[in-house]
Amino acid sequence: RSWFLKYNVTISIDDLHPEQGWGCEGDESVGYLEELNKEFGCKFNLFIPSNYHGKYPLSEHKDWVDFWKNKDWVELSAHGHYHDCRNGGPGECEFAELDYNGAIERISDSMSEWSKCDYLPEGFRMPGWLCNQESGRAIGEKYSYVAIHSHLNDSINFGTKTIKGEVGIHKTDSINVWNNTFMF
């Protein structure tokens, strides 16, 4: 526990959305995050789809966005718009099936939802980690940084800052430390 006193810890969590059990006030998981922040000072980067599976548009859940954005130990980041494929692409890898123009349109739809909640995320992570060079270029043009998979996205030139990660800490050969902050 003493190493927590020397470093900041930031934990990234994907797929939060305004559905009970997925990050709503009063959910057991939210209590765990609050306790980790209180006890250890952990900070969280929440990657949030702006209209999860077409069922939870953020603009209809502004109070949910406000709940999270009012916590100074949380950063809200974009995690696609639908978090699923609309054109027969692979699973939930929304940006794997989009060309440049399709990605720009999808990002615009996402930013519109966020804007209606008086918030514009600076960071982005692709649902399912995957994209192609064209959609990756569009993502890089619209966000300050992209959280990428350390192996799946190596060949993509995003044209913006990238932060590498894995599916889980058990898959990581080493823990990344950046500016005195552990990155999980």
Regions found by a protein language model. Give the residues of each.
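Amphipathic alpha-helical segments that form well-ordered structural scaffolds
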Residues: 32-36, 109, 113-116, 138
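Active-site beta->alpha N-cap acidic-glycine motif
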Residues: 1-71, 120
